[in-house]
Amino acid sequence: MAGSVNKVILVGNLGKDPEIRRTQDGRPIANLSIATSETWRDKNSGERKEKTEWHRVVIFNEGLCKVAEQYLKKGAKVYIEGALQTRKWTDQSGVEKYSTEVVLQGFNSTLTMLDGRGGGGGGSFGEEPGGDFGSSGPVSSAPRRAVAAGGGGRNSDMDDDIPF
């Protein structure tokens, strides 16, 4: 293989409102905590079990930070695409620590609100090919959706059925 791939795709719910902070030169950084869950039936008891995994997500893309700040709230369902990165840092007592995070930065990052604004549809935000590096706007995604303008309930045909 000529190269390698570092791509993470998550669909989950925000565990808390996004934390927005700014660099010294004023650029925003958004931190998200996303929960993904899997459920199964225990073979012995027949009892339904669930395991939740928590993921740290850091957004360095200014446009995506604005979307996170304005529209994302605790409990919101999101689809994200980013890269897995591990960083090393030293805590206050001098102990070296490591954090592994999903990073949304640059061109290969996507943030899609699956709940939509106001409950209907969803909105997709990411880097448009050939666009400005820091800009972000609605882009087409696999299930083509426009940014929701608000209102409306969930579509009944959007259940868990796969269209093929």
From Swiss-Prot:
GO biological process terms, semicolon-separated: DNA recombination; DNA repair; DNA replication
Start-end of DNA-binding region: 54-60
Complex and partners: Homotetramer.
Domain of life, per lineage: Bacteria
Gene3D superfamilies (alphabetical): Nucleic acid-binding proteins
Motif Important for interaction with partner proteins per record, residues: 159-164
A GO term, aspect molecular function: single-stranded DNA binding
Record's keyword terms, sorted: DNA damage, DNA recombination, DNA repair, DNA replication, DNA-binding
Protein name: Single-stranded DNA-binding protein
GO CC term, one of those recorded: nucleoid
Region (Disordered): 118-164
Biased composition (Low complexity): 135-148
Cystines in this chain: none
Function as written in the Swiss-Prot or TrEMBL entry: Plays an important role in DNA replication, recombination and repair. Binds to ssDNA and to an array of partner proteins to recruit them to their sites of action during DNA metabolism.
Domain named SSB: residues: 5-111
Pfam families from the UniProt entry: SSB (PF00436)
